[in-house]
Amino acid sequence: MSEFSGVTVVREANIYFNGAVASHTVLFPDGSKKTLGIMQPGEYTFSTGAAELMEILSGELDLQLAGETGWRRIGGGQSFEVPANSSFTMKVQTVSDYCCSFLS
């Protein structure tokens, strides 16, 4: 889905890592939530509360989920899930556009 209808967008941005990662929150009528964002090249570790589905819309990164020893290359058009109460590290290789869905 390339666009969302009938949603509320939170005006204030979510800024991480001194501005290298930024997103905006999108709230849906059914109570679900997504963030749409952009990541500059660099290495970033995030922790999760809820489980997440990360869709990489464009760009390229290397991914390591908590407990994994190796890295996986993820590119535009691919996605990955992160369990609740976990963490993941990304080595972003090129500017990457993403959509993060919070799963219940």
From Swiss-Prot:
The enzyme's E.C. designation: 2.4.2.1, 2.4.2.2
Keyword Membrane set for record: no
UniProt GO molecular function: guanosine phosphorylase activity; purine-nucleoside phosphorylase activity; thymidine phosphorylase activity; uridine phosphorylase activity
Domain of life according to the entry: Bacteria
Annotated CDD domains: cupin_PpnP-like
Alphabetically ordered keywords of this record: Glycosyltransferase, Transferase
Gene3D superfamilies: Jelly Rolls
Catalytic activity: a purine D-ribonucleoside + phosphate = a purine nucleobase + alpha-D-ribose 1-phosphate; adenosine + phosphate = alpha-D-ribose 1-phosphate + adenine; cytidine + phosphate = cytosine + alpha-D-ribose 1-phosphate; guanosine + phosphate = alpha-D-ribose 1-phosphate + guanine
Membership in a protein family: Belongs to the nucleoside phosphorylase PpnP family.
Protein name: Pyrimidine/purine nucleoside phosphorylase
Biological classification of the source: Bacteria, Pseudomonadati, Thermodesulfobacteriota, Desulfuromonadia, Geobacterales
Name of the coding gene: ppnP
